[in-house]
UniProtKB/Swiss-Prot annotation:
Keyword set, alphabetical order: Amino-acid biosynthesis, Diaminopimelate biosynthesis, Lysine biosynthesis, Methionine biosynthesis, NADP, Oxidoreductase, Threonine biosynthesis
Name this protein carries in UniProt: Aspartate-semialdehyde dehydrogenase
Entry binding sites for substrate: Q164, E243, R269
Organism: Buchnera aphidicola subsp. Baizongia pistaciae (strain Bp)
Transmembrane parts of this sequence: none
Residues holding phosphate: R104, K246
PANTHER family reported for this sequence: ASPARTATE-SEMIALDEHYDE DEHYDROGENASE, DEHYDROGENASE, PUTATIVE-RELATED
Record function comment: Catalyzes the NADPH-dependent formation of L-aspartate-semialdehyde (L-ASA) by the reductive dephosphorylation of L-aspartyl-4-phosphate.
Molecular function (Gene Ontology), one example: aspartate-semialdehyde dehydrogenase activity
Listed pathway(s): Amino-acid biosynthesis; L-lysine biosynthesis via DAP pathway; (S)-tetrahydrodipicolinate from L-aspartate: step 2/4; Amino-acid biosynthesis; L-methionine biosynthesis via de novo pathway; L-homoserine from L-aspartate: step 2/3; Amino-acid biosynthesis; L-threonine biosynthesis; L-threonine from L-aspartate: step 2/5
Lineage: Bacteria, Pseudomonadati, Pseudomonadota, Gammaproteobacteria, Enterobacterales
InterPro entries given in the database record: Asp-semialdehyde_DH_CS, Asp_ADH_gamma-type, Asp_semialdehyde_DH, NAD(P)-bd_dom_sf, Semialdehyde_DH_NAD-bd, Semialdhyde_DH_dimer_dom
Length: 369
């Protein structure tokens, strides 16, 4: 018998990508979907593969929610906080799959990334776990690209610098980034290509605009286009941002590490739209050759591609422009550092909305249906 599965937040950015992937993989043929809304209950629901799925249900109606076998939420932490615990309190024993961060570190929650921790997921289902949550986007993308080194237990510690896309903050942030880009172009467009105007004068006009009150920065609070923001999320007591804290904490939970792998670094927002990039310095436990490392990385999963450490390959295949909209999680710039043969550099790229958010949720369903 097909399971009844509720989808909440399916029209948002992550939810839309999730539904798109589910259609692409013919997932909707394998269960009965019920679509919910937090703001437009009783509105017309979607038609998928020629089948109309009825009006939207109220996402806050516990009586409807509690009748379902599985709930998938891409609605965010506020919704999870309002609904999840109430559902559990009234005895709902179904599976909760969530993209939000609020439940990740709870003891009764499993962080899901099946190419990395499928055994943990299966064991948790057998043990009665009911809550499965996607990981932080940078963590999931790092583990996809560097998974072979983790699975072979070759890593002693990692330092990382992230280059995170606007999509990690949400849809309105992507829109604001594009508005900033458009505003800068409008300011400069009348002068570009005109030899009578020096590029320094044009740059000054754009710079003055970006520092003015006219510049669109309601969400970011500061310019991102033509700039960057070296801080993401709240401040922790030790001086880390919460985004930086998540990397070590979530990685070791996903890996079920007996001894924590030490990971730290700086998380930076840049003007990419939906692809996160990361630069790593990795201390290996032993000296192994670059060809061996490349083979270990390639063997881990079918989405990881090793990009040769050459300028043309790197510029054409190891960028957000090359990776956006794909499930590829390439890794490149692999070389030993001058400080020692156990020290490895690496650079990775991955789509924040796919492996960084929606794809682990979609694949989790395979374990449950």
């Amino acid at each position: 018998m097909k399971k009844n599965i509720g989808l909440i937040g399916w029209r948002g950015m992550v939810g839309s990508v999730l539904v798109e992937r589910m259609i692409c993989e013919n997932d909707f043929f394998h269960f009965n979907p019920i679509f919910f809304s937090t703001s437009q209950k009783n509105s017309k629901g979607p038609t998928i593969n020629g089948e109309y799925f009825g009006v939207l249900k109220d996402a806050y109606d516990l009586d409807i929610l509690k009748e379902l076998d599985i709930l998938i939420s891409c609605q965010g932490s506020d919704y999870t906080n309002k609904v999840y615990f109430k559902l559990r309190d009234i005895g709902w024993n179904g599976y909760w799959i969530d993209a939000a961060s609020v439940l990740r570190m709870n003891q009764d929650t499993v962080i899901i990334l099946d190419p990395v921790n499928s055994n943990t997921i299966r064991e948790s289902i057998d043990s009665g776990f009911k809550t499965f949550v996607g990981g932080n986007c940078t963590v999931s993308l790092m583990l996809m690209s560097l998974g072979g080194l983790f699975s072979e237990k070759l890593i002693e510690w990692i330092t990382v610098s992230t280059y995170q896309a606007a999509s990690g903050s949400g849809a309105k942030y992507i829109e604001e980034l594009l508005m900033q880009m458009g505003s800068m172009y409008t300011e400069a467009s009348g002068y570009l290509g005109n030899p009578a105007h020096s590029i320094l004068n044009i740059e000054k006009k754009v710079r003055n605009l970006s520092c003015s009150d006219k510049f669109p920065k309601k969400n970011f609070k500061v310019p991102l286009a033509g700039s960057l923001i070296p801080w993401i999320d709240k401040k922790m007591r030790n001086g880390q941002s919460r985004e930086e804290w998540k990397i070590q904490a979530e990685t070791n939970k996903i890996l079920s590490s007996n001894k924590d792998i030490l990971i730290d670094g700086l998380c930076v927002r840049i003007g990419a739209l939906r692809c996160h990039s990361q630069s790593f310095v990795i201390k290996l436990k032993k000296d192994i050759s670059i060809p061996e490392i490349e083979q270990i990385l390639l063997n881990h999963n079918s989405w990881t591609k090793v990009i040769p450490n050459r300028k043309h390959d790197t510029m054409t295949e190891l960028t957000p422009a090359a990776v956006t909209g794909t499930l590829n999680t390439p890794v490149g710039r692999l070389r030993k550092l001058n400080i020692g043969q156990k020290y490895l550099s690496a650079f990775t790229v991955g789509d924040q909305l796919l492996w960084g958010a929606s794809e682990p949720l979609r694949r989790m369903l395979k374990f449950l249906i």
